[in-house]
A protein has these predicted regions:
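Cell-wall polysaccharide-cleaving catalytic domain and substrate-binding groove, primarily
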Residues: 1-87, 99-113, 120-152
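Mid-length scaffold segments of soluble, non-membrane domains
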Residues: 92, 96-97
Length: 152
């Protein structure tokens, strides 16, 4: 399960979304994020895309790091915690990576509806949110990998 900062953030968001079963909903979001880590990088913090600047477990690009930090700030994370996050995703702790991922997801316009469904284990919503808010231009190989690894 997520560590303290990521888990506290997630619980605040799920409370805002009025989920019924907090424990189960946290677990579904956690499992979904682990599937994304596996799809993106085989859960390797030192992974690099090669063809883009994407790196780390969630494959944040150089350009998306500052955007995610801004979203963390807008979503209520402490400035000190944000400041401690390197601009290089290879250097992130698991908790920093998870906080960046969660804030980046929950801050995006239109994400609440899909994240609310993910909190109840909706696999179609998991895939849709992944394609809409994280990997916005998947090739056939990525789609095949998602279909193989994103399972409940």
């Amino acid at each position: 399960m997520y560590k303290l900062k990521a888990l506290n953030f997630l619980k605040k968001q799920l409370t805002r979304l009025k989920v019924v079963d907090m424990e189960a909903s946290c677990l579904y979001i956690y499992k979904w994020s682990r599937m994304i880590r596996k799809i993106e990088s085989d859960d390797n913090p030192k992974a690099s895309a090669g063809s883009t600047s994407a790196k780390g477990v969630y494959q944040f690009t150089d350009a998306s790091v500052q955007t995610a930090k801004n979203r963390m700030h807008n979503m209520g994370f402490f400035k000190e915690d944000i400041r401690e996050i390197s601009s290089n995703p290879h250097n992130w702790t698991n908790e920093q990576a998870d906080c960046m991922f969660l804030a980046n997801m929950f801050a995006q316009k239109g994400s609440d509806k899909l994240l609310g469904k993910i909190a109840y284990g909706d696999l179609d919503a998991m895939k849709e949110a992944y394609y809409k808010f994280h990997h916005t231009n998947p090739d056939k190989a990525t789609i095949k990998r998602v279909d193989k690894l994103m399972v409940i």
